[in-house]
């Protein structure tokens, strides 16, 4: 479904990504792991069209989308749930959700909204409440719901556990698993190594803009290099 080949990216003269290769098959959960500054968010931005790679290519559903504008990539079915959630705090929950379906017809919007409220009954209860008054966990639900309103094929989660309590982190990862079981392909970009490897089918580890480890998640969980670098073991 997604094939990334030899992606290089830079901010001015500062190289951030140096030859990233990765792929996702339909129905998978694939994790991209790394510490702050490793290049994870830059990779996301290059996949979603916010930045154009200096070199390399991005293919999605068999089409080369390198350099496409973000809205065209969203129309193709790839959508990002951004770090920090990026809701409109002075709009209601319902208005924020509807932002995700502005390109959809009325029938599609209604159907997708029913689906979101089925997954997140709490959002239905708070649909008229201002998004800025929600708790951190509820805001993350709203950000995910907004993305589901676009009827995506691939969801890219950028640090979904950031700023959440341990209990809410558990709930968030369970929610991602539930969405995947409904057939959604997921790219999970995270610092939470243990939870991510428990959830994912495969994983890539990025350090200083390059992939240093990759493979099946259960195998990587036992890798001594990863344990030393990220778990202090």
Q: Predicted regions: what is each one?
A:
Residues 1-233:
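Glycine-rich phosphate-binding loops of nucleotide-dependent enzymes
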């Amino acid at each position: 479904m997604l094939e990334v080949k030899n992606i290089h990216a830079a901010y001015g003269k500062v190289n951030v990504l140096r030859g990233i290769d990765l792929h996702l098959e339909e129905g998978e959960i694939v994790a991209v792991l790394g510490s702050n500054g490793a290049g994870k968010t830059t990779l996301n931005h290059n996949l979603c069209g916010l930045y154009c790679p200096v070199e390399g290519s991005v293919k999605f559903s068999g089409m080369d989308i390198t350099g496409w504008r973000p809205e065209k990539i969203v129309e193709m079915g790839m959508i990002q749930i951004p770090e920090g959630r990026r809701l409109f705090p002075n709009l209601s929950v319902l208005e924020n959700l509807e932002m995700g379906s502005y390109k959809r017809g009325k029938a599609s919007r209604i159907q997708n909204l029913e689906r979101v409220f089925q997954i997140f009954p709490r959002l239905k209860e708070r649909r008229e409440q201002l998004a800025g008054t929600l708790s951190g966990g509820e805001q993350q639900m709203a950000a995910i719901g907004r993305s589901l309103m676009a009827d995506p094929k691939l969801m890219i989660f950028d640090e979904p556990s950031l700023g959440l309590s341990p209990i809410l982190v558990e709930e968030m990862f369970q929610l991602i698993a539930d969405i995947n079981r409904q057939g959604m392909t997921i790219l999970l970009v995270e610092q939470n190594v243990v939870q991510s490897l428990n959830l994912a089918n495969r994983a890539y580890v990025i350090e200083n803009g390059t992939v240093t480890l990759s493979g099946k998640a259960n195998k990587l969980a036992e890798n001594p290099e990863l344990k030393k670098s990220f778990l202090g073991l």
